[in-house]
Amino acid sequence: NKSRKRRNRVSFLGAVTVEPPKPIPLTWKTEKPVWVNQWPLPKQKLEALHLLANEQLEKGHIEPSFSPWNSPVFVIQKKSGKWHTLTDLRAVNAVIQPMGPLQPGLPSPAMIPKDWPLIIIDLKDCFFTIPLAEQDCEKFAFTIPAINNKEPATRFQWKVLPQGMLNSPTICQTFVGRALQPVREKFSDCYIIHYIDDILCAAETKDKLIDCYTFLQAEVANAGLAIASDKIQTSTPFHYLGMQIENRKIKPQKIEIRKDTLKTLNDFQKLLGDINWIRPTLGIPTYAMSNLFSILRGDSDLNSQRILTPEATKEIKLVEEKIQSAQINRIDPLAPLQLLIFATAHSPTGIIIQNTDLVEWSFLPHSTVKTFTLYLDQIATLIGQTRLRITKLCGNDPDKIVVPLTKEQVRQAFINSGAWQIGLANFVGLIDNHYPKTKIFQFLKLTTWILPKITRREPLENALTVFTDGSSNGKAAYTGPKERVIKTPYQSAQRDELVAVITVLQDFDQPINIISDSAYVVQATRDVETALIKYSMDDQLNQLFNLLQQTVRKRNFPFYITYIRAHTNLPGPLTKANEQADLLVSSALIKAQELHALTHVNAAGLKNKFDVTWKQAKDIVQHCTQCQVLHLPTQEAGVNPRGLCPNALWQMDVTHVPSFGRLSYVHVTVDTYSHFIWATCQTGESTSHVKKHLLSCFAVMGVPEKIKTDNGPGYCSKAFQKFLSQWKISHTTGIPYNSQGQAIVERTNRTLKTQLVKQKEGGDSKECTTPQMQLNLALYTLNFLNIYRNQTTTSAEQHLTGKKNSPHEGKLIWWKDNKNKTWEIGKVITWGRGFACVSPGENQLPVWLPTRHLKFYNEPIGDAKKRASTEMVTPVTWMDNPIEVYVNDSIWVPGPIDDRCPAKPEEEGMMINISIGYRYPPICLGRAPGCLMPAVQNWLVEVPTVSPISRFTYHMVSGMSLRPRVNYLQDFSYQRSLKFRPKGKPCPKEIPKESKNTEVLVWEECVANSAVIL
């Protein structure tokens, strides 16, 4: 061997001498001397340092120095009582060019062939046997100080590798590696592991091992290195690199983790670093250490305080238990390795096995780079990572990879997943999904969220479509079959959009297609079902992402989500629907929501004041918790005479609001024409209080012509009558003990109280502290904001302008004269909620009637009278066109047969009459003039195909009530038409001559096929 010849020389006595190894010079970033002052040392440590320095001086490891460089030196006492020298070389290391590690990781003892005998040796003082380059010695000088500076300090410099120097491990590995190279070449069939100064030799037989060891001893000695005789291991159990090695098994050395020293981030960082080092042997999945990893979150200062939580304490106990029981196996060099991937919680777990013997565990980091990492991508990443590990261990790819996927899922992964393609690139082995039958893996906690189950990659057929949007002002919304606006605490459009998507997934328990104009939210929603969510310092974002994942996983029906570009001029329904969702979070809608939160104004008032649609205004009211509860069903309004102009007729009453305390007597006045309300809170209801209230009304509303009250003592007193006569006001009272004569003001009392409750419990009007302030806010809402049914302006506008826009004013009408039981032609003067005022003709007093006694006609007055006089009836037959009934909002169709009783004539068709009539005059079904009259039981109702029910038979019996039965109610959505036509064979067009016009038309030739319409 040439290198051996260079090292060895024959002396004149014939003995072989060993030349010292040639030193490796260091590369320096600067030649400027680095001097760090030596700190004082206690007398005991100073004496120990002198002894150690003399010992090293005698061995030739140090020499006296006059170097301009200096590093502090100190000593520590070991458990054995011996002292050890250490030099603080941090400042010197900063100016040394690093050589880089030659062994970036520990060798795995699992690669030692099973049943092979071993010998383990440790090199004695390895660093001190390797010289420094002569030009580098002065840079490692140190000073031994004198107490009280009574004598000059003693200075030395290192001639050998000092402990703590940046490149000492690399230089040591290089020297030892050179010494072992001849051994590896001669005994290539032996398995030799060398790490720093620890050397392990394994051979197939004991004789070969002894030969290898003998040759190794000589080579080590020739290199100037020495073997520590007290650290030679030749029998089991062997201890090497923290492991206990037996003939076939490998176990971690028994240790106990001290928990009392875990105080700072640095303490936990070191602990988890040590645990991660032995995790491939322990087999602790990532999910089982989540609480320990979570402690590392937060402040990045190494000295920042940390608390060991009870959950983390349990995980440390698990680590200690695993250290006591875990074991892996030495391999058979002739058998291939396999990789098993288990779908464990949090992230997948990999296991390297040989046959059924465990070789090593493989895990992914607890935290990821990406915010969302799909579980399939995690599997692919773990496969790629473990393939590299196996190649590093034995130089080959695994023979087989077992994954928790079916063959079809594997095929789809190769097509659709880039991460999968990278993780399995150039793999020529077998991909299988059959796991070996063994109990050693049964403790793993598996997950089912590997591939998406709820999220779809293609649009769903026959599913609802919902559009979402979010704004940066704390509003999220969606539109589709229904609309909803959600108030959020966030000032981010992306987060509000995320809230909108979460709300849609919660509100619609059926298959849906979601369209969003946020690419970020769309991608997050697509991935979140099976994704590992990266922890963020933003708690709000963590909560949103976790809620999104929980919502998706709890769904029973699939969904599809896609992205649409916002604010484009592209045509089509998708763009329009997205704009509609955008409008829901627009400033007008937000202002409408804010006003409703303050005043609880009704939907008509919101639409009148803001640029919002009817549906948006109604949704605001319907989603208000106070208004939803307080909008109770009301009875059909009766007919109370009303004024035909402002201040023509007032109604006045006193109601009680207990929450007002002493001022609980609330005097209420309402103008029966404009519905303008004024109220004052008083301490009583005597005449003086009534007069005080009326003066307040005059200041706001003006002076009325007539006032109607009940028969209370405050209203019937002479003092009150005198007061009214002074103001030229006539006074009437209702029937004693009958509140129906005061129906308008009684209903106003309820409306006012309801508004007070809304505003009190609504939460946005806390500034109104006194009773009168609360009353004023309610009056402002009712008079100046709310718009009531069949009106287009507020009560205040009607009262101040005298203009009342009745939707049917001036139209011809059929009205029922209850005295004569006849129907007459008249003209509408005004039309209100459940009532109307009709002019019977010239020079006749107007008649107040309930709307159920009114029917419209779209004919000239002459034709109508002629039609009425002849009592003409017109049949509707099968051959006629279907009658279209347009739905204004939603319609509740009565059940097939209501057999409870024949109803009153005026009740016939009541349900349908109230619900329909959007484009045409109201159409009713039943026995009443102007109603469609079925003469038979079976009619066919055709519902458009967009409805979930396409066809059903509508049964009716002549003269029967059309009241609905609860179990037969059917809801039809907004603005859809119902087509009614007779069912059966065609009937003759001509009416039989013997039929009577006033009777139900029944044809013998066609029973079940006709109806009459007046």
Curated annotation (Swiss-Prot):
One of its GO terms (biological process) is DNA recombination. A zinc finger (Integrase-type) spans 587-628. Mg(2+) 1 binds at D469, E497, D517. It comes from the Eukaryota. InterPro entries: DNA/RNA_pol_sf, HERV-K_env, Integrase-like_N, Integrase_C_dom_sf_retrovir, Integrase_C_retrovir, Integrase_cat-core, Integrase_Zn-bd_dom_N, Rev_trsase/Diguanyl_cyclase. PROSITE patterns: INTEGRASE, INTEGRASE_DBD, RNASE_H_1, RT_POL, ZF_INTEGRASE. Residues 642-803 form the Integrase catalytic domain. Pfam families: HERV-K_env_2, IN_DBD_C, Integrase_Zn, RNase_H, rve, RVT_1, RVT_thumb. Its EC number is 2.7.7.49, 3.1.26.4. This protein is synthesized as Gag-Pro and Gag-Pro-Pol polyprotein precursors. These polyproteins are thought, by similarity with type-B retroviruses, to be generated by -1 frameshifts occurring at the Gag-Pro and Pro-Pol genes boundaries. Has a type 1 genome. The HERV-K(HML-2) family contains type 1 and type 2 genomes depending on the absence or presence of 292 nucleotides at the 5'-end of the env gene. Type 1 genomes lack a pol stop codon, leading to expression of a fusion protein containing a portion of the Env sequence. Early post-infection, the reverse transcriptase converts the viral RNA genome into double-stranded viral DNA. The RNase H domain of the reverse transcriptase performs two functions. It degrades the RNA template and specifically removes the RNA primer from the RNA/DNA hybrid. Following nuclear import, the integrase catalyzes the insertion of the linear, double-stranded viral DNA into the host cell chromosome. Endogenous Pol proteins may have kept, lost or modified their original function during evolution. Belongs to the beta type-B retroviral polymerase family. HERV class-II K(HML-2) pol subfamily. The LPQG and YXDD motifs are catalytically important and conserved among many retroviruses. This is Endogenous retrovirus group K member 10 Pol protein. It comes from Homo sapiens. The lineage of its organism: Eukaryota, Metazoa, Chordata, Craniata, Vertebrata.
